[in-house]
A protein has these predicted regions:
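ABC ATP-binding cassette signature C-motif
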Residues: 1-194
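Short cytosolic helices in intracellular loops of multi-pass membrane proteins
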Residues: 194-204
Length: 204
């Protein structure tokens, strides 16, 4: 949908190796990041000719809450266990397990309209998972998550889509509701199949 922004939890941990940790997180909102870079570039080559363009870009930047971008990114990083001393470090110098947390912060940055996450709790400790669960529980927009963490799904999900034998079934509820409902449906199918077999034998 036009005007909506989708954010995806990156799986390629080397994709941002030439960027700093803080810069990587801000790149979660690529439009904001590009405006920021353009403003910086125009200031480096400042002239009367580009002053008007700088002013126009700064208006857009303010509308996107750009002046708070670094502090918002830093807050996400700190909540995900990334020390402030690492925020200006290049990504290629970061421990791979910490990169997971940084890319998670990137996906959350800027309150995207649609957030897509594949196994977001991998390599996270209990404290960080608990923080993420609380954060997502208060997230107002759409979240699409794939996870094998049952407790996480129970805490975060309000709807479950189950893909089984090429068919998609949708359930309104968390993981426990889906599990109980799917088990009940499986038992009912088994009973129906049994009755059908018994009736078939009677007719033979």
């Amino acid at each position: 949908e036009s005007g909506k922004r989708m954010s995806v939890l990156e799986q390629d941990h080397s994709l941002f190796d030439s960027n700093s940790v803080l810069e990587t997180v801000i790149m979660g909102d690529i439009s904001l990041y590009q405006i920021k870079k353009e403003i910086d570039s125009l200031y480096e080559n400042y002239s009367d000719e580009n002053a008007e363009k700088i002013g126009s870009l700064q208006v857009k930047f303010e509308e996107m809450d750009g002046w708070n971008a670094e502090s918002n990114a830093a807050s996400l990083l700190s909540n995900l266990g990334i020390k402030e001393s690492l925020h200006q470090t290049q990504m290629n110098d970061i421990d791979p397990k910490l990169k997971v947390r940084i890319l998670l912060a990137k996906s959350l940055f800027g309150n995207p309209d649609v957030l897509v996450m594949d196994e977001p709790t991998n390599d996270l400790d209990y404290e960080t998972i608990t923080w993420l669960e609380d954060y997502l529980a208060n997230f107002d927009n759409c979240i699409i998550v794939v996870s094998h963490d049952r407790h996480f799904l129970d805490s975060v999900c309000t709807h479950i889509s189950d893909i089984d034998f090429g068919k998609i079934n949708h359930y309104s509820g968390n993981y426990t509701f889906w599990y109980e409902s799917s088990q009940l449906a499986a038992r009912q199918r088994a009973q129906q199949n049994k009755k059908a077999e018994e009736k078939k034998k009677e007719l033979e």
